[in-house]
Amino acid sequence: MRFKLHDVHIRRGLCCVADSYISPASINSGIRALIQKGEYLQALHLYSKHDGSSPFWTSVFTFPSLLKACSALTNLSYGKTIHGSVVVLGWRYDPFIATSLVNMYVKCGFLDYAVQVFDGWSQSQSGVSARDVTVWNSMIDGYFKFRRFKEGVGCFRRMLVFGVRPDAFSLSIVVSVMCKEGNFRREEGKQIHGFMLRNSLDTDSFLKTALIDMYFKFGLSIDAWRVFVEIEDKSNVVLWNVMIVGFGGSGICESSLDLYMLAKNNSVKLVSTSFTGALGACSQSENSGFGRQIHCDVVKMGLHNDPYVCTSLLSMYSKCGMVGEAETVFSCVVDKRLEIWNAMVAAYAENDYGYSALDLFGFMRQKSVLPDSFTLSNVISCCSVLGLYNYGKSVHAELFKRPIQSTSTIESALLTLYSKCGCDPDAYLVFKSMEEKDMVAWGSLISGLCKNGKFKEALKVFGDMKDDDDSLKPDSDIMTSVTNACAGLEALRFGLQVHGSMIKTGLVLNVFVGSSLIDLYSKCGLPEMALKVFTSMSTENMVAWNSMISCYSRNNLPELSIDLFNLMLSQGIFPDSVSITSVLVAISSTASLLKGKSLHGYTLRLGIPSDTHLKNALIDMYVKCGFSKYAENIFKKMQHKSLITWNLMIYGYGSHGDCITALSLFDEMKKAGESPDDVTFLSLISACNHSGFVEEGKNIFEFMKQDYGIEPNMEHYANMVDLLGRAGLLEEAYSFIKAMPIEADSSIWLCLLSASRTHHNVELGILSAEKLLRMEPERGSTYVQLINLYMEAGLKNEAAKLLGLMKEKGLHKQPGCSWIEVSDRTNVFFSGGSSSPMKAEIFNVLNRLKSNMVDEDKAT
């Protein structure tokens, strides 16, 4: 029977305790043999039994092994004892023992002791031993393990001053650690590369791998590729992994996947890191086809249950929007670790399957899988999106029930939840409890307040952020939210200051920041400033075009909006539903039916997805162009009807005199479970107004207040006065005005003035006109209305006086106008105008129509 040599030594070591004669060689051999087998505690016990009887028996070669055992067990007590023996024996300057002591103290968590050992060794009388690179490497590595990077780099530089020539390990730990921590500059990295070349250290594959990683961290992918090409032996899978992950992390996903295929074709034995790196590239590029191929390779390699690979597969399918495939991967995993659950919850959350994410979270708890901070942050984000305040608050409570570390991600998610749900006190409590308020935290609070329409509070928080920490530089997300807050408040002056600060930092070039600036100037009535921002941005981005098209529509420049849309098409940029919706608003304001129908057809031909907003815009366009039947067809085919959809159709029927259908649609809306708002009732009262349904209008007005608790605004009151006035109920209209809980504005008195003139009520007409003239003394149309009223009542002197006063003030009435589109041409007609080139034909038609109406009146 054959015995291994170290087994013989072990038996000797164990038996020598009982022997009367102690053999130092046997004990040393036994200790080293035990340590080689990993039986560290037995080795230390064996050492302690004999150290007291004779401290001089231990060999100089045994101490490094003993210190290795102390490091493995992190046993500081034994380590100090052995250190004492080393000092007594005078071997503390031995480079092997010094290295072992430094490593032991670092492993046991006492860096200061390691520094004392190293300093004593490096300052020893033996100048030759102080140049041993192994000890320096241990000390540099120790500094880095304790994240004391400045001291580590200082030690490396001191080593060079001492004339110690770094080896491949020295350079690799400096390069890899400093790159990882971001405390390394490109110039320093290239200097180290040059040092390697000059000293023929470029043959070490481990060091070259660290160099490749360094260049990728610097964003120098070409330099990384050059180093990779120079390596002759490419059999090491770690090298391939660094390249695959590096290109993927640099956004060069195609090269990352090409390298994956190259490694596979060169028979490199791929490991889990290879697959996770390649799947990461597929996730970034949303390359589901290649991702499926890698999935097949994973199954062939038997890694389909590897937690890291499975997590990457779930992430890849999630980023590609393939939630079904992610569910399949998840269900096939036998041992579902927390990382797997988290990846599936994140997949649901990222793809707007919020309720599925919450269901899976509940299932996790049923399976007694304890969530971590990553789980809870995703769950809270889902609650925020779904508006589930109470559920989110219950999840927040779990942070207090169990010792889950509250990360900045969780705190930011909670800030967004509470801010979005309008729970400002809770949001501020979370914010104040944060030890470190980073950019994400400030951004979450500001963004949440903006989404909830609390723009003043958002700007105050932004000001507090600048006062709290000057070193924080707002990112594009925060500046977008701040600009949106300025737009919501129409705070032009502050918005200009924000714009100026963004020009200095270069953030204005960001597409979302630029679009928010366009929106700001649009809402402040400065389309020319919005255009300047637009022209400074990339013309290839759809968001910028949409913002500018919407800006022109909002500022009553529909023709410019339509022209800009056509320019966008001519530059090869295909519109989305937002573009179509914005330009439809412009077309609606011009009542250009042909353009509207043409755009509708274009949308259908290109297969642009029609969301609710787009369909609402189409309904609005057809209603305003007088084609309510087209609007009705779109309405009936809509599966999801928003409140705006119902309001548009009710308004459409009412504006075309079909009050009965409008009222019927209102009943249908209530049956569908949609609650009306103030706009709904305004449309209904307006419908009754157009059709002369006085009692129905009065009932709806009372119904709005009593049954739905909606307080009427000035438009509701104006429509009611107009309804009563048109029906000739002038005294009731005047009593209605006097009973209003708010002071009547000019629109109310204008309605009463028009009705007074129609029904020849001079007294109320004069009263209304006087009220109007006090409110708007420069309004010429009021003078004209009152002059006409005087003339019709035979009060010519009063009319002449008022006409003289009007001329004295230089006032005149803007003539009303109407237009009609015929053969793709818009014909405009002004009240009292006769400048049309076809005026003769027009007057002939008008005379014939008048004769026909007179004849029909006589016949009836």
Swiss-Prot record:
GO BP of this protein: RNA modification
Span list, region Type E(+) motif: 824-854
Taxonomic superkingdom: Eukaryota
InterPro entries: E_motif, Pentatricopeptide_rpt, PPR_At4g14850-like_plant, TPR-like_helical_dom_sf
Region named Type E motif: 748-823
Alphabetical list of Pfam families matching this protein: E_motif, PPR, PPR_2
PPR repeats: 59-93, 94-124, 132-166, 167-203, 204-234, 236-270, 271-305, 306-340, 341-371, 372-406, 407-437, 438-472, 475-509, 510-540, 541-575, 576-610, 611-641, 642-676, 677-707, 713-743
Gene3D superfamilies, alphabetized: Tetratricopeptide repeat domain (1.25.40.10)
A GO MF label: RNA binding
Protein keywords: Repeat
Coiled coil: none
Family membership noted in the UniProt record: Belongs to the PPR family. PCMP-E subfamily.
Protein name according to UniProt: Pentatricopeptide repeat-containing protein At2g40720
Species this chain originates from: Arabidopsis thaliana (Mouse-ear cress)
Lineage of the organism: Eukaryota, Viridiplantae, Streptophyta, Embryophyta, Tracheophyta
Gene for this chain: PCMP-E26
